[in-house]
């Protein structure tokens, strides 16, 4: 569907790798059996692309944690790439299972086994949540029946914002490594909540220009978070804000200080200047200005607690385990993953 779609021409045909079967929502299949057969051909493609870079910054991977392929094979791929390029940044955009909308029964298993890997092997993980995306579509964009296309539109805005400084000139540049250095106070705490402002639906990019205060206000708003966690229930360890468009740096700095002063109780006091700002001159298409928000908040634990509770409920009864042990997994792995999370 990618090849026949409008973007089929963007990718080189020999850079497509696909297998004959899916992992059937089974993490073990993606990580140990089916995925392991494919992973070498994927690594060949990665190697070929990496060799043609003059200065490789790192890798970005988009996957879901609820299924089998994205979670199982995705984490396998991460650990393999990590082996081969240990000093390069590893970034993931991970779609975490949402609290109310569940696609598969075994989501908690797959997600827990994946987080177990992500904690060790990635430098920054952006937690994206379908439910939070649906909420943004309903509440803010007033869409009655959001499609995956609408959800993807939101995610792509964030992804574009995170990498914008690598791709365009700006007054205050940040790249993936600078982000990681500024955002991760302790190596395991690299799970971020993304946000974006101004929120627009796909067809109707807004016609009115926003001001810097409005952008700042909007991007710190809990309703703008793309993970189903409420930042007001926790505190920010660090925050990164990436502004795009022509704007006064002075105003940006003032607004960012303003937010920290007004809401100082939501920022930990033991990291004094914990907001990193980057400004890039070129705005996204159709907007005059935009801002991407990346928060490393303690509230992200809500998400892990939720998955963990569901995991425990099923694991206590050993429900569905035979699908995993049948692919050669051990119950110990489950116990380890649970305690690591």
From Swiss-Prot:
Cofactors that this protein relies on: Mg(2+)
SUPFAM superfamilies noted in UniProt: Tubulin C-terminal domain-like, Tubulin nucleotide-binding domain-like
GO biological process: microtubule-based process
Top-level taxonomic group: Eukaryota
Subcellular localization, as worded in the UniProt entry: Cytoplasm, Cytoskeleton
Pfam hit, one: Tubulin
Binding site for GTP: 64, 68-70, 130, 152
Gene Ontology CC: cytoplasm; microtubule
MF annotations from Gene Ontology: GTP binding; GTPase activity; structural constituent of cytoskeleton
Keywords: Cytoplasm, Cytoskeleton, GTP-binding, Microtubule, Nucleotide-binding
Transmembrane intervals: none
Similarity comment text for this entry: Belongs to the tubulin family.
Complex formation: Dimer of alpha and beta chains. A typical microtubule is a hollow water-filled tube with an outer diameter of 25 nm and an inner diameter of 15 nM. Alpha-beta heterodimers associate head-to-tail to form protofilaments running lengthwise along the microtubule wall with the beta-tubulin subunit facing the microtubule plus end conferring a structural polarity. Microtubules usually have 13 protofilaments but different protofilament numbers can be found in some organisms and specialized cells.
PANTHER family noted in UniProt: TUBULIN (PTHR11588)
Function of the molecule: Tubulin is the major constituent of microtubules, a cylinder consisting of laterally associated linear protofilaments composed of alpha- and beta-tubulin heterodimers. Microtubules grow by the addition of GTP-tubulin dimers to the microtubule end, where a stabilizing cap forms. Below the cap, tubulin dimers are in GDP-bound state, owing to GTPase activity of alpha-tubulin.
Name of protein: Tubulin beta chain
Species this chain originates from: Haliotis discus (Abalone)
């Amino acid at each position: 569907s990618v090849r026949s779609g409008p973007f089929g021409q963007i990718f080189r045909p020999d850079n497509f790798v696909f297998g004959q079967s899916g992992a059937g929502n089974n993490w073990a299949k993606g990580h140990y059996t089916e995925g392991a057969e494919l992973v070498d051909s994927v690594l060949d493609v990665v190697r070929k692309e990496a060799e043609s870079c003059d200065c490789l910054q790192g890798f970005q991977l988009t996957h879901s944690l609820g299924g089998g392929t994205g979670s199982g094979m995705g984490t396998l791929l991460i650990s393999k790439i990590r082996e081969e390029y240990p000093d390069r940044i590893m970034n993931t955009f991970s779609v975490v299972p949402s609290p109310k909308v569940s696609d598969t029964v075994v989501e908690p298993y797959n997600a827990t086994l994946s987080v177990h890997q992500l904690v060790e092997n990635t430098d920054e993980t952006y937690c994206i949540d379908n439910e939070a995306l649906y909420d943004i579509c309903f509440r803010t964009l007033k869409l009655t029946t959001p499609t995956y296309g609408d959800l993807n539109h939101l995610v792509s805005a964030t992804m574009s914002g995170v990498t914008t400084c690598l791709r365009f000139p700006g007054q205050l540049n940040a790249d993936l490594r600078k982000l990681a250095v500024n955002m991760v106070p302790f190596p395991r705490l690299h799970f971020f909540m993304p946000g974006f402002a101004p929120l627009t639906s796909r067809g109707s990019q807004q016609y009115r220009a926003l001001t810097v205060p409005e952008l700042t206000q909007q991007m710190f708003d809990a309703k703008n978070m793309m993970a189903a966690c409420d930042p007001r229930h926790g505190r920010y360890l660090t925050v990164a804000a990436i502004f795009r468009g022509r704007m006064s740096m002075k105003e940006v700095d003032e607004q960012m200080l303003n937010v920290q002063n007004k809401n100082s109780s939501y920022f930990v006091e033991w990291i004094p200047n914990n907001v990193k700002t980057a400004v890039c001159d070129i705005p996204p298409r159709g907007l005059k200005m935009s801002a991407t928000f990346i928060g490393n908040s303690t509230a992200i634990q809500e998400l892990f607690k939720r998955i963990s509770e569901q995991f425990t409920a099923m694991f206590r009864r050993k429900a569905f385990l035979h699908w995993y042990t049948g692919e050669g997994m051990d119950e110990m792995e489950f116990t380890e993953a649970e305690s690591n999370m």
